[in-house]
Amino acid sequence: MTDISVSKIRNFCIIAHIDHGKSTLADRLLQDTGTVQQRDMQEQFLDSMDLERERGITIKLQAARMKYKADDSQEYVLNLIDTPGHVDFSYEVSRSLQACEGALLVVDASQGVEAQTLANVYLALENNLEIIPVLNKVDLPGADAEKIKQEIEEIIGLDTSNAINCSAKTGVGIKDILEAIVRRVPPPQDEIKLPTKALIFDSYYDPYRGVIVYFRVISGSLNKREKILLMASKKNYELDEIGIMAPDQQQVDELHAGEVGYLAASIKSVADARVGDTITLLNSPANDPLPGYKTANPMVFCGLFPTDADQFPDLRVSLEKLQLSDAALKYEPETSSAMGFGFRCGFLGLLHMEIVQERLEREYDLDLIVTAPSVIYKVNLNHQEHIFIDNPSTIPDPQLRESIEEPYVKMEIYAPNEFNGTLMGLCQERRGVFIDMKYITTDRVTLIYEIPLAEVVTDFFDQMKSRTQGYASMEYHLMGYRKNDLVRLDVLINSERADPLTSIVHKDKAYGIGRSLVEKLKELIPKQQFKIPIQASIGSRIIASESISALRKDVLSKCYGGDISRKKKLLKKQAKGKKRMKAMGKVEVPQEAFMAVLKLNQ
C-alpha cells in the first residue's frame, strides 16, 4: 500500500513540439528528484524504443513517479506522464491529458510556438488542466525569451508573467519548475470512497507477462487481490501484480484515487486493453465508464509486400506481434499479380506508417516494398448505394458508379510570413481551398486550408518542410467527405493491369501523372525479346502510352551469301516466334521499377 495522502500527489504531463527539449527536461526532473541515480542515467530515459531515441520523438507513452521534498519541507509525489507530440498520436495525447491535473507547456526560446504544441494546448485546456509555461533552451545564443512570452500570450492567451526560464541541458531553472508543479498544479480530487474507476492511458506488450497496462486511478482504489473488469471490451481478469513506475516497476499491494501505476493480468493483446478504457472491479463495478473513449480508426492505407516471397509467413507473424503492442494497426492479406502475397495495412497517419515499416524492418529483419499510401474513398454506386474502399485497384468501373467522394481535412499551417507565397503555392498544387489567413505576430502567420487527405498523405509534410527551410509546422483534423471529379488511373504493361500502380487521381491531373508514369516505366523495365507496350488508362480510354522496343537477335549471321529465300525463311520463322512470345511472354517488372514509380507517384 502506498500511504501517501491525495493532497500530496501531483499528476502532470509535458506538452512540447518535436525537438523543443521535452525528453531532456524529463531526464533532468528524474535526476534532480533523485529518482534515477546519476550512474544509471542515459539520455532520453523515458523514450525506451531505439527508434524513439534516434528520431528524437516520443511514440509510446511512458510514466514515472518522483518523490520531491519541496521548500515547505513536505514530501510530495509527482507523477510525470509523458505524451507523444506528433499529430498522428493525438488520441493518445488526449487520454494522457485526462490522467493529469496540470501540464508544463515547453516552448523552445529560440523557435517559438509550433502547430503541434498548439493542438495539444487546446486539448489540455479542454481537460481543464493548469498550464505552466516553460521557456526551454534559454542558454542558446538565439534565444529571445521575452519575444516568445509575448507570442504565447498572443497566440494561446496564457498569462506568462510567471513563466519559467530554464535550460534542461545545463540544469538552470529545474528547481523552479518542481516548485511550480507543487504550488500551481491542483491535487487530484479525493474520491477514495466512490466506486473504483481507473483510466488506461497506455499499454504495451511484454512477451513474458502479457499486456502491461498503465493507468491512473480516478476514484476508489485497486487492490492486487481483486478481479477487474474492462468496461469497453467487457472482459474480466485476475490481477497478477500492480505497482508504480519509479521509473522501473515496483510492486505494491494497493493504489488509491489520484495515483498512477501499472498492472499485469495476463491480458493477451493490447487490443483487449485499449487506451481510454475504464478499469473497474468485477464484484462491485461502477455504473458508467469514464467519458471520451473511442477506438482509433486508421486514416492511411498501403500495401506491404516482402521483397522475397519466402518471407511472407515471417511478415504475417511479425505483424501479429506488432499488433499486440500497437492497437491502432489494422491489416488484412492481399495478393497482387506483380508483387505476390502481402498485406493491406491501415495506419493513423504517415508517421505511424513509417514507424511501423521501420520497426518491421529493424526488429523483425524483413525487407519490404511499400505501395503508395491511399485513403478511404466513398464510392456512390448507380443504385443509391455506397461503399467505402481503401484500395484503389478495387474501385468499380466507371459505368457501375455514379461518383467518388474523398475525405477532406482542415489544415492549419504556422510559418514565418516570408514563406507565405511558397506555402500558398504548395496548397494550391495540392487542390487546397483557401479559407483564412491570420497574422499571429508581426512576422508569423497562420494559413487555414481545406485539403483532400489524399494530397496530404503522400509527401506534403516533406515538401512543406523543404520549401520553408524547416520552419513551418502543421496540424490537421478530418472534416468529412466531398464529391470530386476523381478517376481511377490504371497502368497496363503488355496489356496486363499492374495493380500496385493503380491510383485515384483528379481528372485534371490524370494526364500529367499518366504521362510521367509510363515514361518512368519505359526507362526502368529491361528490354525483352518482344515489343512491350506500356499504357496509362482511365476505364477503357488510353491517355498515355510508350513502348519498349524488342531486343533483336541477328538470325542471318550464319548465312554467308547464298539464296535470298533461305534468309526470308529464317526471318519469317523469327517473326513467328516473336509473335508467339508476345502472346505467351510475361513481363517481369523489376522491384526497383515499382519503387521508383511509387516515389514518382508522390
Curated annotation (Swiss-Prot):
Enzyme class: hydrolase
InterPro entries referenced in this protein's UniProt entry, alphabetically: EF-4, EFG_III/V, EFG_V-like, EFTu-like_2, G_TR_CS, GUFP, LepA_C_sf, LepA_CTD
Amino-acid biosynthesis listed as a keyword: no
Protein name listed in UniProt: Elongation factor 4
Organism: Prochlorococcus marinus (strain MIT 9301)
tr-type G domain: residues covered: 7-189
Xref: PROSITE patterns: G_TR_1, G_TR_2
Localization per record: Cell inner membrane
